[in-house]
């Protein structure tokens, strides 16, 4: 569902490099202290998107007719909503840092 690992690794590097630069330039630890929370917030958003794409594009044997109708409604909404298309594009290429 989009190979999110590489995007997440790049964002980890972004957050870590900022934290290390701040620490070694001025001794500031604020970014270092927030590093895990900042990364995890982004990771869970990517995880949510991957889960959503999987449920949108795959069918599972344990799901019944109701879920099939929900999946079709979601696909219909996705194909007709500019806002939804923008959201999926933003998530697919990687959320802003």
Predicted regions located by residue number:
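Glycine-rich phosphate/pyrophosphate-binding beta-alpha loops
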Residues: 1-7
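C-terminal helical "tail/cap" subdomain of flavin- and related membrane-associated enzymes
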Residues: 3, 18-97
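A general alpha-helical scaffold signature found inside nucleotide-binding enzyme cores
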Residues: 8-11, 30
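Extended, folded domain segments that form the structural surfaces/walls around functional sites
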Residues: 10-19
């Amino acid at each position: 569902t989009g190979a999110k690992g590489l995007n997440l690794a790049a964002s980890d590097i972004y957050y870590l490099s900022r934290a290390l630069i701040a620490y070694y330039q001025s001794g500031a630890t604020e970014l270092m202290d927030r590093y895990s929370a900042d990364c995890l917030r982004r990771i869970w958003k990517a995880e949510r998107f991957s889960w959503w794409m999987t449920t949108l594009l795959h069918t599972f044997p344990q799901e019944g007719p109701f879920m099939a109708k929900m999946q079709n409604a979601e696909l219909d909404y996705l194909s007709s909503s500019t806002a939804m298309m923008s959201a999926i594009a933003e998530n697919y290429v990687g959320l802003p840092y």
